[in-house]
C-alpha cells in the first residue's frame, strides 16, 4: 500500500481552473510534494495528457460522472473541490465516496470544499452598504444564514456528514478574486488565468458602452488576489496534515478568503476610467444597469448584494494577505484591456 497522501482535486481546467489550477500548481511546488499522490478530475483528454507530465494522475470525466467521482473520493485521504460550488450531484458523490472510505478504514478523510462569500449575500440590490460583518470564527452567526442563500444547500450537506463523523470538512469561501494567474499550469495551457466576476461586469459595461453598477453601487464586497487565495488553501492543507485536531471543522470549519473590501461603485468607476482611456466610453461615471441589461448580460442580481466578512480563522492559520483594495482597483485597467481583446462569457455563475 502506498505511504503517500492521496489528494484528489477537481476544477483545475476551464473557467473553474482559475482557483483549482492555482491550488494544484501550489501543491506541485509544495516542499512535501514528493509525499503526495495527486489525482485530478477533468473533462479534456488532451489536457489530461498534459497533466501527466506534471506527475498528476488525471481522471477524465465531468461533474455529472458521479460514479467516477465517488470512486476517486473513496481512494483519497484529502479531497479539494474547486469546481462548481452549487453542483449537488458531484458533492454528494464525493460525500458517498468519503463515507465508504471511512467505513473501510475507520479514518476520517478531509474534505476541503470551495464555497463562496455569496453565501453571505443580502438583498441590497446595490442600494446600501450593510453594517453586518460575518466572522468565520462565529459558527452561531453562520448557522443562522438562510438555507435559501447561495451555496448553503451544498455547505450544509457537507457539514451534516462531518457531524455524523465520517469526514472532517473545511469550507473555504473566496470573495471577489482578482489578478491574472501566472504559474506552470497556465503556461502549459491547462488552467484558466482569469477571474470571473470582474470580467463579466466589465464585458457587460463594454457592450452597453458605459460603466455599469447594480442600483447605486453602494453594496460592499470583499476581495482577494488569486495567488494569496492559493496560499490560503495550502496553509489549510498544511494545518490539516500536521494536526487535524487543532483545525476547526464541520460547522466551525469556515475559512474566508477575504483580504479587504470595496464598493461596486468604486470598482465600476475605475472600470469607467479605463474605458474612457481606451476609447470605449465617453464618461467614466457609472450608471445603473437596467433590468433589461441585467437579464441580457448578467446573472441576475448576484453581485448587487453586501457580503462583508472577517477572516479570523484564515488568519489564524498564518495567512497574511498583503494585496488590498488599492491593488485590486489598480488591476482593473488590465482586466478592461483583456475583455476588449477577448470578451468574457456572460451570464456565468460568478459567486
Residue map of PLM features:
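Glycine-/Pro-rich loop/turn segments that contact NAD(P) or position catalytic residues
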Residues: 85-89, 96-197
Amino acid at each position: 500500500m502506498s505511504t503517500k497522501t492521496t489528494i484528489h482535486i477537481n476544477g483545475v481546467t476551464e473557467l473553474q481552473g482559475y482557483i483549482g489550477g492555482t491550488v494544484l500548481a501550489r501543491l506541485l511546488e509544495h516542499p512535501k510534494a514528493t509525499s503526495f499522490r495527486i489525482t485530478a478530475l477533468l473533462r479534456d483528454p488532451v489536457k489530461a495528457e498534459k497533466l501527466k507530465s506534471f506527475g498528476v494522475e488525471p481522471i477524465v470525466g465531468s461533474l455529472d460522472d458521479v460514479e467516477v467521482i465517488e470512486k476517486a473520493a473513496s481512494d483519497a485521504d484529502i479531497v479539494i473541490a474547486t469546481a462548481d460550488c452549487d453542483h449537488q450531484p458531484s458533492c454528494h458523490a464525493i460525500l458517498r465516496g468519503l463515507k465508504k472510505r471511512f467505513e473501510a478504514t475507520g479514518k476520517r478523510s478531509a474534505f476541503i470544499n470551495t464555497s463562496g462569500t455569496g453565501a453571505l449575500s443580502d438583498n441590497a440590490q446595490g442600494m446600501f452598504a450593510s453594517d453586518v460583518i460575518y466572522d468565520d470564527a462565529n459558527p452561531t452567526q453562520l448557522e443562522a444564514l438562510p438555507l435559501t442563500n447561495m451555496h448553503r444547500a451544498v455547505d450544509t450537506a457537507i457539514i451534516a456528514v462531518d457531524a455524523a463523523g465520517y469526514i472532517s470538512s473545511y469550507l473555504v469561501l473566496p470573495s471577489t478574486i482578482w489578478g491574472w494567474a501566472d504559474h506552470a499550469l497556465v503556461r502549459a495551457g491547462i488552467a484558466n488565468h482569469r477571474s470571473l466576476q470582474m470580467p463579466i461586469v466589465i464585458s457587460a459595461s463594454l457592450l452597453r458602452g458605459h460603466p455599469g453598477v447594480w442600483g447605486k453601487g453602494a453594496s460592499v464586497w470583499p476581495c482577494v488576489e488569486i495567488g494569496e487565495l492559493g496560499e490560503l488553501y495550502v496553509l489549510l492543507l498544511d494545518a490539516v496534515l500536521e494536526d487535524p485536531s487543532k483545525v476547526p471543522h464541520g460547522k466551525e470549519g469556515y475559512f474566508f478568503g477575504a483580504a479587504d473590501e470595496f464598493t461596486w461603485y468604486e470598482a465600476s468607476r475605475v472600470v469607467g476610467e479605463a474605458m474612457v482611456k481606451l476609447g470605449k466610453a465617453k464618461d467614466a461615471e457609472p450608471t445603473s444597469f437596467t433590468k433589461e441589461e441585467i437579464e441580457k448580460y448578467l446573472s441576475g442580481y448576484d453581485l448587487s448584494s453586501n457580503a462583508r466578512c472577517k477572516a479570523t480563522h484564515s488568519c489564524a492559520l498564518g495567512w497574511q494577505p498583503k494585496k488590498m483594495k488599492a491593488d485590486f482597483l489598480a488591476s482593473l485597467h488590465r482586466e478592461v484591456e483583456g475583455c476588449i481583446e477577448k470578451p468574457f462569457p456572460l451570464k456565468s455563475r460568478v459567486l
